[in-house]
Amino acid sequence: MTNIRKQHPLAKMINHSFIDLPAPSNISSWWNFGSLLGLCLMIQIITGLFLAMHYTSDTSTAFSSVTHICRDVNYGWTIRYLHANGASMFFICLFMHIGRGLYYGSFTFLETWNIGVILLFTVMATAFMGYVLPWGQMSFWGATVITNLLSAIPYMGTGLVEWIWGGFSVDKATLTRFFAFHFILPFIIAALAMIHLLFLHETGSNNPSGISSDSDKIPFHPYYTIKDLLGAILLLLCLFSLVLFSPDLLGDPDNYTPANPLNTPPHIKPEWYFLFAYAILRSIPNKLGGVLALVFSILILTLIPFLHTAKQRSMMFRPLSQCLYWMLVADLLTLTWIGGQPVENPFITIGQTASIIYFLIILILMPLTNLLENKLLKW
């Protein structure tokens, strides 16, 4: 009797992607984050679906509907905090996944990398719109400040902002459309993730050494399914620890105050995972310049494959590049810290310095270090 796993059209597709997939034998735990992102997306879609059953996207009832979910719905508080902290876990995995791609040279798979950058933008847009939905103070003012940035676009900016708002300020129309987009985007993310995987399976996975692993492959199942399962258990352990012991650790206390257009919070700031980009935005005094720097801070990822001048793909055997890489990580952590601080000295100066260092490392120092390491190879 023929094996249904290898014969049935649908089972065959799953088999080729997750069971009999030839995988390099030496990939480390840094390769776990792809599957963890899939798990995070599933958690977000399921918890989001249950939240949408009780949420009302109306300015007069949105805040109280979230309160109702937490107080009156059976295990509503768990679902709400799983969704909120699940987003934080999503971004932790996302940053680790991108960091691994940069360190081990996975960006040379151009299609996979570029779809990944599109995915990052989509996830960021989804998270931003989700933050607006509880209709607390930080939700309202965050939405006002961030959407207002589009008014910096010459000629069409003001009209574009009013078009997004659906009026002359962030109001009922804005909340309703943000809810609609926030609901549909995760499914678009899931579709993009499938395309991401499709392109990855065209080339096969990279590995820590950065050299071809065609001569030494092992089946994905059981080796990497077990490994991914361990990662999933650890992720769920962290997520549930956060949800059950300290659910508001990563949130903003201002969001427990209903949105009030007449009262501006002293420090408007987004969620922690946007703070690095927010710090870059704030470090430029000019509005249009700030917006361009903000967009380019993410878009710069698409340039990395073209700035890669090294003979070796991975940083595993390139100590100078490793030093620069960890400087970049430290710089991003500094930017994240600065993004949460008030706009006053010395924070302004630190933010501007860290922003310059960020672009300097990626655009100039990395390619130069790569060329220097190429020279050192000949010694």
From Swiss-Prot:
The keyword Electron transport applies. GO terms for molecular function: metal ion binding; ubiquinol-cytochrome-c reductase activity. It is a multi-pass membrane protein. GO terms for biological process: mitochondrial electron transport, ubiquinol to cytochrome c. Heme b b562 binds at H83, H182. The chain crosses the membrane at residues 33-53, 77-98, 113-133, 178-198, 226-246, 288-308, 320-340, 347-367. Heme b b566 binds at H97, H196. It is found in: Mitochondrion inner membrane. Heme 1 (or BL or b562) is low-potential and absorbs at about 562 nm, and heme 2 (or BH or b566) is high-potential and absorbs at about 566 nm. Component of the ubiquinol-cytochrome c reductase complex (complex III or cytochrome b-c1 complex) that is part of the mitochondrial respiratory chain. The b-c1 complex mediates electron transfer from ubiquinol to cytochrome c. Contributes to the generation of a proton gradient across the mitochondrial membrane that is then used for ATP synthesis. This is Cytochrome b. It comes from Euoticus elegantulus (Southern needle-clawed bushbaby). The lineage of its organism: Eukaryota, Metazoa, Chordata, Craniata, Vertebrata. The gene is MT-CYB.
